[in-house]
Each structure stands twice: as C-alpha cells, then as structure tokens.
C-alpha cells in the first residue's frame, strides 16, 4: 500500500517530523486494491499486503473490512505485512477483523536508532507495537524480511524481547512498553506462524502426525538472560526427522 519509513515513502496521516511538507505516499489506487482483494478472496486466495505507515495500515484495514462485509464470513486469515506504525484506534481492529499482523522484529532495533527523528516522540509509542497487539488478542507472527534484514529467527527473538537498538543506546529497550516475553516471541515464530499460512495441522508445534522439522540449539532459550539470546547458535537442523545440518 505504501513505501518505507527510511525513504519517507511510508504513508502517514500527519507529515513527517523532519519533512513537514511530506506525509509519504499510497502506492496503490484504493478502489483498484479493493477490487483485486475482493476478487482474490472470492477465489479463496489468502491475501497479504504490505503496509508500514499509520495511514497505509488504516487504509488497508478499511479495505479488508469492506471486503469482509461484502463477501461474507469465512476463514480468511488476511494478513498485514509489517503493520509497523499504527494509529492507536486501529490496534483492536486486527483482532476484530481476524486480521493477522505479520511483523519483523529486527527492524525495531534497527529503525529504533533514528525513527523518532522522522516521526516524533508520540507516534513511536505504537511503532512495532508487539505487546499492544498481543494484548488486543491479535494473532502476531514474526518473520525476517530477508534479504533486507538478517534471516535469523534467534536474532529476531532477541529483538522482540529486548528491543535493544543496534547502537546500544537503549539498554532498557526502545519503546520498552512494547517488549514481549520469550514465550510470546517463540509462538510468533512457530505455532502462530504456521496458523498464519493455514499450516497449523502439519507444522508449528512438535506433535505426532506433524512434520518433524526442528533445530537443536546451543542453549535453552528459556533458561538464559534475554540479552544472551543473540549469542545462541544452531547445533543441528532436522527436516522431516532427518538431520540436514550439523555444526561441527
């Protein structure tokens, strides 16, 4: 629906703090977007759309809501990719509409170094709003945005749990109110991620009858300090119960 924060092309309701003449851009014609989404939904295709700025997210949620009302109830699992900057009033709408927030926690500790310069101290409070979304009963799932960001889910969990920016200037976490627990981050990368792609019956948890895809880590993530998560390494990887990687 829009661009990115760093390029000032993410679409916001209010202008950028450092560029008061600019509020970003919507990259899609909204009427066309609704038509495309509605047609795809009628073919039972799952819809996932990029939205970063608060205007873009609001516009996409409005479009999703219109399509849901027009096409009737069913198990859609519409997704918003990024859901990065949200209007406070839109946070509860994800759960109300059964829309999944698909987010990339690494970006929080990267953008956190400079985001406030671009959008000011108020709007950052609902930037990468992991905890607010979970508290509103949203299905939150995590990914990497690779190759734009590192692919490692371990580093992503570190980012979600600590929110310590890459410049080490926020030891208590950038917007610490939005930090989540390790268990919540694990669910976002596993169980809920599988649900978000209609794969919960075959993966996401280790259960009889599901794919035996798993890793063995150097440390128990639940037994170490959150600051040490980023140092954890993969000792072995299994796909379908067969070892496909071993760290020698």
Regions found by a protein language model. Give the residues of each.
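Metal-coordinating catalytic core of metallo-dependent amide/deamination hydrolases
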Residues: 1-54, 58, 62, 93-100, ...
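His/Asp/Glu-enriched, well-ordered alpha-helical/loop segment
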Residues: 38-47, 55-78, 82-83, 88-92, ...
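Extracellular/periplasmic ectodomains of large secreted or surface enzymes and adhesion receptors
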Residues: 247-248
């Amino acid at each position: 629906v829009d661009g990115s924060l760093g390029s000032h092309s993410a679409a916001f309701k209010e202008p950028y703090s450092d560029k008061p003449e600019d509020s970003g851009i919507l990259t899609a014609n909204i009427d066309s977007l609704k038509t495309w989404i509605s047609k795809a939904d009628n073919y039972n295709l799952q819809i996932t759309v990029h939205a970063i700025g608060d205007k873009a997210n609001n516009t996409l949620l409005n479009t999703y809501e219109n399509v849901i009302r027009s096409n009737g109830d069913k198990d859609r699992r519409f997704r918003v990719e990024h859901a990065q900057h949200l209007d406070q009033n839109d946070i509860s709408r994800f759960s109300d509409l059964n829309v999944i927030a698909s987010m990339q926690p690494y970006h929080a500790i990267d953008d956190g170094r400079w985001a406030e310069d671009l959008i000011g101290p108020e709007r950052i409070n609902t930037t990468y709003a992991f905890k607010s979304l979970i508290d509103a009963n949203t299905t939150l799932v995590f990914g990497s945005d690779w190759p734009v960001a590192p692919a490692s889910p371990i580093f992503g969990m570190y980012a979600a749990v600590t929110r310590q920016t890459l410049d080490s200037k926020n030891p208590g976490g950038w917007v610490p109110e939005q930090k989540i627990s390790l268990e919540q981050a694990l669910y976002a990368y596993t169980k809920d991620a599988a649900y978000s792609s209609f794969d919960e019956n075959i993966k996401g948890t280790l259960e009889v009858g599901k794919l035996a895809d798993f890793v063995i880590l150097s440390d128990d993530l639940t037994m170490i300090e959150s600051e040490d998560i980023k140092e954890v390494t993969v000792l072995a990887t299994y796909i379908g119960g067969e070892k496909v990687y071993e760290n020698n």
